């Protein structure tokens, strides 16, 4: 009886040792898999419409930089669309590690959900705006409608193309640039709003994003003038030098696209280090020069001056602070029932 019990005990001990050995092998195997995943880090950049070409080139530079510095291979997935729509996609569960959106307000909407930490604007230089732009007009070669300034956009028979401020960050900048001109010209709120009403009465197609509006104007041949990001207009003229030209209005606005980590996502994904490096590298000299070559205005003033032949650095530019900052401006002009809705529903 004792011998039988002893054998049973030995069998149980043997089973436990086998089970323990199996668990240890499994843990080592899983650790090995984890290391492999770390060797091929993947992040997703949720961005707005016209940045596609810039980030395609930037990502290649960054991947090389990260490999040279850390010896690790990185993959960057790009996602593009209207800035407001992209912000909502992150709020609704899109697994972006970083957001590079058209305006601060879109990132603040994500911040309000707790996905992005408060104070994100101060995480990187220049209020987390590594590059800027402004708003210009793109017309067909020859400029048959003689469009020279904002006042020409309200003429009878002029068809204007601009995206929808409800989904496009660029469209919000377009609206505010036009409003800046109206403020300087009329000095009367009623007349300013009448000007904006006439302008939007001339809008024939209103796409959901800036790239969609460019496609409508360039590929579908709709409209006489496109209100556009300066960088988008520069790229279009570069691609079609004999078909389009840029008109710089007398007054525009300093458009500041913003960038941020999506803090909750990078924590879950284990990508905080790579995502932080990704955004920091936007401020490197190489990335700043690339931004300039792609039509964006570098935040580095020294590098910006090197491209002064490409950009008009002496024109009057309104700033978002002139409209009370984004929180105030969005409530006043773009929320449901605000000024844009009143203007657009009066048509």
Mark where each language-model region is:
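Short helix-loop capping/hinge motifs at secondary-structure junctions, enriched
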Residues: 142-148, 167, 180-188, 265-273
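Ligand-binding pocket segment of bilobal, Venus flytrap-like solute-binding proteins
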Residues: 185-250
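Periplasmic-binding protein-like
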Residues: 129-136, 196-200, 207-208, 239-272
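Short beta-strand->loop
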Residues: 46-48, 139-141, 158-185, 199-203, ...
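N-terminal segment of the mature folded domain
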Residues: 37-167, 314, 344-345
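Bacterial N-terminal signal peptides that target proteins for export
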Residues: 3-20
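Extracellular/periplasmic juxtamembrane helices and adjacent flexible linkers that interface
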Residues: 266-347
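C-terminal motif of bacterial Sec signal peptides marking the signal peptidase cleavage site
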Residues: 28-32
